[in-house]
């Protein structure tokens, strides 16, 4: 483990994220203006594709960070069995789950049951497939549905808040199964499927259409749902972060596109692969 990741073990991750959340939610003119303008300059953020194209149009940094796209800014792949990217970002890893193990980085894997915080769900997806999409700070930070499905359960899993990037993925064991996350489970034409929204350092929160903003707790919290989504529908959003993981069962027989590999830049709605019903 390198110095950068080692230091993160000793900083007060939750407190830092809590303070960041308060500042990001502030509507004080000086606070929001300073944060928004500094961030936009640091990450060369363009508002050309967004509904509100002035930095002054946002009520807080959170409002800016979760800014909405213009209608038709993204094309949702319409192929019947197509699995699309849930977010703008970069493919961190994708492929098959082998005997409960997903690839995190070269030479490092982690357990699907630990990711989902449920051993029975882990067994169900033991030989399925997955795609991990990392959202960079400058990306559009809403998460959309990669397939049609009915949301049946959400599971909030408390955890650490390591930053998420190539360095931590390569150095922090079980990174995605250790960080705070929200597991969303769906009934689909392929059986049960999941979208996991993973938090990170300074991530101020996770919100979904079904749950509203998730309240942080010390215990796993589950809720049952019965909400239908179409591919491309908004599922939720990150306040300052991080990673979305799509998980499909073995029965889906997912065939990922040859062009999709580690480091591929993707947009929400772009075809990642195809499943079979």
UniProtKB/Swiss-Prot annotation:
Topology within the bilayer: Peripheral membrane protein
A UniProt-annotated Pfam family: PS_Dcarbxylase
Note on how the cofactor is bound: Binds 1 pyruvoyl group covalently per subunit.
Superkingdom assignment: Bacteria
The protein's annotated pathway: Phospholipid metabolism; phosphatidylethanolamine biosynthesis; phosphatidylethanolamine from CDP-diacylglycerol: step 2/2
GO molecular function: phosphatidylserine decarboxylase activity
Listed transmembrane segments: none
GO biological process, alphabetically ordered: phosphatidylethanolamine biosynthetic process
Chief location of this protein within or outside the cell: membrane
Modified residues (Pyruvic acid (Ser)): 242
Reactions that this protein is recorded to catalyse: a 1,2-diacyl-sn-glycero-3-phospho-L-serine + H(+) = a 1,2-diacyl-sn-glycero-3-phosphoethanolamine + CO2
Subcellular location as annotated: Cell membrane
Active site: 88, 144, 242
InterPro entries (alphabetical): PS_Dcarbxylase (IPR003817), PSD-B (IPR033177), PSD_type1_pro (IPR033178)
UniProt keyword annotations, A-Z: Cell membrane, Decarboxylase, Lipid biosynthesis, Lipid metabolism, Lyase, Membrane, Phospholipid biosynthesis, Phospholipid metabolism, Pyruvate, Zymogen
EC identifiers of the protein: 4.1.1.65
Broadest EC class assigned to this enzyme: lyase
Post-translational modification: Is synthesized initially as an inactive proenzyme. Formation of the active enzyme involves a self-maturation process in which the active site pyruvoyl group is generated from an internal serine residue via an autocatalytic post-translational modification. Two non-identical subunits are generated from the proenzyme in this reaction, and the pyruvate is formed at the N-terminus of the alpha chain, which is derived from the carboxyl end of the proenzyme.
Annotated site residues (Cleavage (non-hydrolytic)) in this chain: 241-242
GO CC field: plasma membrane
Family statement: Belongs to the phosphatidylserine decarboxylase family. PSD-B subfamily. Prokaryotic type I sub-subfamily.
Task performed by this protein: Catalyzes the formation of phosphatidylethanolamine (PtdEtn) from phosphatidylserine (PtdSer).
Subunit description: Heterodimer of a large membrane-associated beta subunit and a small pyruvoyl-containing alpha subunit.
Protein name: Phosphatidylserine decarboxylase proenzyme
